[in-house]
Amino acid sequence: MVLIAACILSKTGKLLVARQFVNDMMRSRLEGLVDAFPKLIGNEKEAATRQHTFVETDSVRYVYHPLDNIYLVLVTTKNSNILEDLETLRLFVRVIPEYCRSNEEKEILAHDFDLIFAFDEVVTLGYRESVNLAQIRTFTEMDSHEERVFMQIKEAQEKAAKQAMAEKAKELKRAQKEALSRGLKPSYQSSTGISSSSTPNAAAVSEPAAPRPSAPKGPIGGGKALKLGGKTNNEDDFLDTLRQQGQSIAPVQKASLSGGVSSLAAPISTAPRVKREVVHVRTEEKINTRVSRDGGLESGEVQATVTLSIGSPEFIPISIKMNNGSAAGTQLQVHPNLDKKEWQSSSTLKIKPNGKPYPVNSDVGILKWKMALSEEEQLPISFNCWPQESSDGVQVNIEYTLQREDITLNNVRIIVPLPTATAPSVGECDGEYEYHKTKNVIVWSLAVIDSSNSSGTLEFSVPNGHCDHFFPVSVGFTSENLFVPITVQKVVKNDGSPVTYSVETTFNSENFEIV
């Protein structure tokens, strides 16, 4: 097909919006084609009642659709495919209500540029693009998740700077009152030019002028703190402030604010901190997976790192006996400074003879593993997302099933995107839910998922939208149970005497999506 132009005309023949898609046609020629259209349909009695119809001249074809007080007209070549033209016309008809509340002439003129931008997403150089209505809306909005995160951090920084200034002012007032109560002149008050010998008690008795609040020292609210991707000393304070305001954001990576997991789905651990002994072993395990909405695993991988921290030199010559419960397909790798033969024969982590000793008070990686997932049944939790379109809107049902009952999931959050400016009506929810209007998402939260609540459901409906609006679904959780059960059995010195040690294990979802 070759689509020459798309036009919106009033029933009286007035041209409201026109978008030309070919470059080899003069404006006067296009205006002549558009002006001829009302005359061609003027004698057709059924023109106002037909759903889809067309008229032809010697050179072009007009495919049009009547909409209340307007006509939507596509001007095409005569050799174009009429079926494709009608399909394109139907998409154009669906575009207009997305940007205009009615089909009145005033409303069309008020959103003419919005319609032109949308038309450009449908047709390029006279040929139809493979897009749907949701994609057109996304492309024209040009929404940026990174920009939203940056603005949130910027607002938090400004608020933190104001709080710091207020605290500094209070501190200065307290120091002023304490100095007055002791009968001393505050050290921060500037000299008035009067000799202290001439009026010895004036400075001590008179009420000093209120000090001007000075800008807080350090990087609080400084220009460099707003640098995108920059690392500042107060970064953790700003992120903590965000969390106190109810926002959950992922750690800001250097040189980029974008990540595979949305800020709301970033795992937050509320597990009590382990009392650290002189010998401390920490295992951190993460899962990355993409699951198809129709079922089946697109990609999946579990990665883990075991680190060792020793607080005293006398405990450096130690051996760590591990319970190796790794499944088939798990790739394990020990540190090059450790004895691989000891690991292969007895699952013991021990420094090689004449090897470099462990550093003191420093986390050192000693073991890591990676496991590729090939089936959805291997995941610790699975989801069934089922949006159903109807004349009243879209009914969405989401069900989770805990597949590994030996793993207890904490702080589980399922983030479901929603159509723009659409509030959900929740019918059933196991756990809690929260609607974030600014982010256009509904967050389904469960404090704990274990064998006692191994399945649950969230049901809600929205008045508009379609199935693609509710994907991808992001999932965040944390757990103290490892996916690959490789744990510490005992820690002993080289002479065989036992060593008191502490263990810390975490299993988090780094990027868990249903697409």
From Swiss-Prot:
Record organism: Caenorhabditis elegans
Taxonomic lineage: Eukaryota, Metazoa, Ecdysozoa, Nematoda, Chromadorea
Predominant location: cytoplasm
Protein's recorded name: Probable coatomer subunit delta
Function: The coatomer is a cytosolic protein complex that binds to dilysine motifs and reversibly associates with Golgi non-clathrin-coated vesicles, which further mediate biosynthetic protein transport from the ER, via the Golgi up to the trans Golgi network. Coatomer complex is required for budding from Golgi membranes, and is essential for the retrograde Golgi-to-ER transport of dilysine-tagged proteins.
Gene this protein is translated from: copd-1
Record localization: Cytoplasm; Golgi apparatus membrane; Cytoplasmic vesicle, COPI-coated vesicle membrane
GO cellular component: COPI vesicle coat; Golgi membrane
Region (Disordered): 161-231
Alphabetized PANTHER family for the sequence: COATOMER SUBUNIT DELTA
MHD domain residues: 276-515
Low complexity composition-biased segments: 187-198
